[in-house]
Amino acid sequence: MLLAFVRTDPDVPKHRGISALIIDTDTPGLECRPFPDLMGPDHLDFNEVFFDDVVVPRRNLVGDLNDGWRICTGALAHERAMLWVLWSEGLDTSIADLVRCVGDTPLAEDDVFLDRLGSLLIDAEALRLLGYRGLARLQRGLVAADQSLLKLMGSEGQRDVALLALDALGADALDQRKGTSVFQPWGANRGDASWFDRFLNSFAGTISGGTSEIQRNIIAERVLGLPRG
């Protein structure tokens, strides 16, 4: 099944003429072509989708006609907020994995490495507390912490841990045994990924659900109250 946001009224401005549809992938005229990404030819999490005179029954309409933008933004906000739990746990686990990999090597006493590691630990704690604050506010019926901030900190935090591992471990970052973790934020059977694999895969998190650039724009306008550029 696909959730598609389609233009249903071309005569209204901007976001008003979009509707949300559930589309069966077996529908005649619809073709999904999986394609590999940086993680390798067997990593097929993404597809390009083609529609050739596809007909979708009206019962597949989600919500009201031309109300798709509200549904889209609501779904994205929910996704960004709920993924906070995975981002937070994944960040803690990745940092612990890196500390284990460094062990008692000279890096464990390197000031530059320790400074970067300390910054990541602070960011991980800030992410956790920000998420808890948002949940507490929701329980009281108040506005939650901005979901875009949670998404931005979580996804970029995973990338930054992997980047530090690459800088610190050098060629060892290509060794799958150096990156093994019981926590698998990228999906089942990928817990043996090397730090290099983790680094490549981390970019998916900074793109899906709205890129980091989009999140920064949202934070600037809706949280900080800055004017639209």
Predicted regions and their residues:
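Short Gly/Pro-enriched turn/cap motifs at secondary-structure boundaries
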Residues: 10-12, 38-45, 189-190, 209
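C-terminal helix-coil-helix/basic helical segment that borders enzyme active sites and/or dimer interfaces
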Residues: 103, 107, 111-114, 125-186
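Glycine-rich phosphate/cofactor-binding loops in nucleotide/flavin-utilizing enzymes
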Residues: 69-80, 84, 169-229
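Structural beta-strand/beta-sheet cores of well-ordered domains, especially the beta-sheet scaffolds
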Residues: 2, 18-19, 28, 45-52, ...
